[in-house]
UniProtKB/Swiss-Prot annotation:
Catalyzes the conversion of (8S)-3',8-cyclo-7,8-dihydroguanosine 5'-triphosphate to cyclic pyranopterin monophosphate (cPMP). The keyword S-adenosyl-L-methionine does not apply. It comes from Trichodesmium erythraeum (strain IMS101). GO terms for biological process: Mo-molybdopterin cofactor biosynthetic process. Substrate binds at residues 83-85, 121-122. InterPro entries: MoaC, MoaC_bact/euk, MoaC_sf, MoCo_biosynth_MoaA/MoaC, Mopterin_CF_biosynth-C_dom. Keywords: Lyase, Molybdenum cofactor biosynthesis. The active site is at 136. This is Cyclic pyranopterin monophosphate synthase. NCBIfam families: moaC (TIGR00581), PRK09364.1 (NF006870). It catalyses: (8S)-3',8-cyclo-7,8-dihydroguanosine 5'-triphosphate = cyclic pyranopterin phosphate + diphosphate. Homohexamer; trimer of dimers. The keyword Lyase applies. Belongs to the MoaC family.
Length: 166
């Protein structure tokens, strides 16, 4: 039985009329300023949080390393996610915000480009890898660290318009 995917083509842009995956052709799109912000959190025991805050981790600079990893990951998104376009990124900002109420860290990433397609995946990848790196750097202190609530907060630019989480 052959399935007709043509009616889905407009909504499912990464599928062709036969249902096979494809990379979207953005060659006719106009370059515009695109920006996306993503967030996540890393929860840990109070003792682990305090050790990181004091700089007492056996692996060294936990927060600095996680920040650099997030920046590097945003730049490598097209290598990690098969149908993402490689983009020239003009700005990547990563914040690891101490949150004693979790306890742990809120992670935020903002990515900006002037391109034909958006940077949502780059922002989400930056947060994800920063969180994974924080875990890796702190796992000698605690194995039960939890990575939570990775999500897109906002995006601007492009034909689909702006988005902001409610």
């Amino acid at each position: 039985m052959t399935r007709d995917f043509s009616k889905f083509e407009q909504n499912l842009t990464h599928l062709d009329s036969e249902g096979a995956v494809k990379m979207v052709d953005v060659s006719t799109k106009v370059q515009t300023i695109r920006q996306a912000e993503a967030a996540g959190q890393v929860r840990m025991l109070p003792e682990t949080f305090e050790a990181i805050q004091r700089g007492n981790s056996p692996k060294g600079d936990v927060l600095g390393t996680a920040k650099l990893a997030g920046i590097m990951a945003a730049k490598q998104t097209a290598q990690l996610i098969p149908l993402c376009h490689p983009l020239p990124l003009q700005k990547i900002d990563i914040e690891l915000i101490p949150d004693p109420h979790l306890p742990g860290y809120q992670i935020r990433a903002m990515v900006k480009t002037k391109a034909e397609t958006g940077v949502e995946m780059e922002a989400l990848t930056a947060v994800s890898v920063a969180a994974l790196t924080l875990y890796d750097m702190a796992k000698a202190l605690e194995k039960s660290i939890s990575i939570e609530l990775i999500r897109l907060l906002s995006k601007s630019g492009g034909k689909s318009g702006d988005y902001m989480v409610k």
